[in-house]
C-alpha cells in the first residue's frame, strides 16, 4: 500500500533538501498508520542528540544513523545535514546514486540504511517522548 498525505503540506516550514529526502525515504518504508514525525522524538537517539544505550531495535537504527553522519562529516567539505543526493524509491527498496565514497553517496547510504531499518523495526508507543535523563544514561 502506498500512503500519501498532503493535508497541511502548505504549512510545513522549509527544510534542507537532505532532510526532505530522508523524510521521503522514511515514509516509503514505515507502516501507513505512522508518520515520519513520530520517529523524531523516540528512544535515546531518534531526534536531536543522543546518549546512553539505545533502548530497542528502532532506537539502534537512529544510533547507527547518528554514527554514520559522524563518519560522513569527516569527508572534506561534507555536511551530512545539508548535503543533497540522488536516489530512487523502487520495488520496496531504495537505490542511492553517485560515486562511492563521495559525501553525497555516503549521506544517501546513511539515510537509506536508517529508513530501511525503521521499516524492519517494531515501533513501541511507550518509547516515544521518554524521559531521556532517566532512561538514556
UniProtKB/Swiss-Prot annotation:
Q: Which GO terms describe its cellular component?
A: extracellular region
Active site feature: 65, 111
Q: Which Gene3D superfamilies match?
A: Phospholipase A2 domain
Q: Sorted alphabetically, which PROSITE patterns does this protein's record hold?
A: PA2_ASP (PS00119), PA2_HIS (PS00118)
Q: Which reaction does it catalyse?
A: a 1,2-diacyl-sn-glycero-3-phosphocholine + H2O = a 1-acyl-sn-glycero-3-phosphocholine + a fatty acid + H(+)
What does the entry state regarding organ or tissue expression? Expressed by the venom gland.
Where along this sequence does the record place binding of Ca(2+)? 45, 47, 49, 66
Record's keyword terms, sorted: Calcium, Disulfide bond, Hydrolase, Lipid degradation, Lipid metabolism, Metal-binding, Neurotoxin, Presynaptic neurotoxin, Secreted, Signal, Toxin
- Principal place of residence: secreted
Q: Name one GO molecular function term.
A: calcium ion binding
Give disulfide pairs as residue numbers.
Answer: 44-136, 46-62, 61-117, 68-110, 78-103, 96-108
Q: What is its EC number?
A: 3.1.1.4
Residues of the signal peptide: 1-9
Q: Which Pfam families match?
A: Phospholip_A2_1
The record places propeptide residues at: 10-17
Required co-factor(s) are: Ca(2+)
- The record's top EC class is hydrolase
Q: What PANTHER family does the record tag this protein with?
A: PHOSPHOLIPASE A2, PHOSPHOLIPASE A2 FAMILY MEMBER
Relate the protein's function as given in its record: Beta bungarotoxin is a presynaptic neurotoxin. The A chain has phospholipase activity. PLA2 catalyzes the calcium-dependent hydrolysis of the 2-acyl groups in 3-sn-phosphoglycerides.
The subunit field of the Swiss-Prot or TrEMBL record says:
Heterodimer; disulfide-linked. The A chain has phospholipase A2 activity and the B chain shows homology with the basic protease inhibitors.
Q: Family, per the entry?
A: Belongs to the phospholipase A2 family. Group I subfamily. D49 sub-subfamily.
Protein name per the record: Acidic phospholipase A2 beta-bungarotoxin A chain
> Which organism's genome codes for this protein?
Bungarus candidus
Q: What is the lineage of its organism?
A: Eukaryota, Metazoa, Chordata, Craniata, Vertebrata
Amino acid at each position: 500500500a502506498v500512503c500519501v498525505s498532503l493535508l497541511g503540506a502548505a504549512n510545513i516550514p522549509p527544510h534542507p533538501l537532505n532532510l526532505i529526502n530522508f523524510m521521503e525515504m522514511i515514509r516509503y518504508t514505515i507502516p501507513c498508520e505512522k508518520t515520519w514525525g513520530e520517529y523524531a522524538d523516540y528512544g535515546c537517539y531518534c531526534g536531536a542528540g543522543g546518549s546512553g544505550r539505545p533502548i530497542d531495535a528502532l532506537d539502534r537504527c537512529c544510533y547507527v544513523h547518528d554514527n554514520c553522519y559522524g563518519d560522513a562529516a569527516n569527508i572534506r567539505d561534507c555536511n551530512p545535514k545539508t548535503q543533497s543526493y540522488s536516489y530512487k524509491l523502487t520495488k520496496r527498496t531504495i537505490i542511492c546514486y553517485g560515486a562511492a565514497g563521495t559525501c553525497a553517496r555516503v549521506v544517501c547510504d546513511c539515510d537509506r540504511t536508517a529508513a530501511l531499518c525503521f521499516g524492519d523495526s517494531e515501533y513501541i508507543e511507550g518509547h516515544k517522548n521518554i524521559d531521556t535523563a532517566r532512561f538514556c544514561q
